[in-house]
Amino acid sequence: MKYAFYPGCVSRGACPELYTATLEVCNILGIELDEDSLRSASCTGAGVLQEKNLRLGDTLNARTFAMAEKAGLPLMTICSTCQGVMSQANQRLVSDPEYLASINEDLKEEGLEYKGTINPKHLLWIIVEDLGMDFFHSKVVRKLEGLKLAPFYGCYIVRPTEALGFDENPERETSLEAVIEAVGAEVVDFPGKTLCCGFPILTINPKNSVKMVANHTIDAKDRGADAMVTPCPLCHLNLDGYQPNASSAAKRDIDLPIIHLPQLVGLSLGIDPEKMRLNKHIVSTKKLLSELAVAP
């Protein structure tokens, strides 16, 4: 399987370990990534641009879709925020031919045209739907038995459901749990798994953002979680990067490692943790890896 790879901004900047782990995992799973076709693609706007200029945001995403179309490839992302923003933009574009035509007028300058055939897809869904769980099971060489994991979807990969295709693909609602179970770990369910991590308000209300980090991580920890796994790099940035602040605010040492989805998958595939930069997180994964008898 070959995809036009849209890594998003964060995995090439603040979370390089996500990008590295993705390359390692896709290599073993037989997912071929074409980075060249989208090398000059723009940021999705992350929902922030859309609040100020919806048309500009849709134009940028239509440009990315047109590049993937030109390459003749489906589009894969590893960012839940990118997934959500792209899916919403795509819904607006394909549901309104006149609007799409006007956007394409802007794309003519680069010799591009979006025909409406792209369905942006997160790596999580590609594993569950395109590869299939039977295939994924066959690739698992290290069962992570005894590990208790709290899934954290965040906002953008679960809503709005109509833009994300949940009606046609109801398995997406529990896709993260399916992967956790497939690697042999135990799912620790908790109410906050589909709520906001707090990242969008970090710069305007840092106190509440840190409080949200504390609420989610403490709840998961108190329910027995050894770690939390997320398909969203922005959620990882907040839940991992600001967990020390959350610990200070809550006056307790939370110490809950936050794992990127590809890192979790990679551990089950036998990939060296150092290759996936699991030693580069703010909240140390050393104890977790030691308990799994995996060298940190």
What are these model-derived regions, one by one?
Residues 1-296:
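Iron-sulfur cluster-binding electron-transfer modules in prokaryotic oxidoreductases
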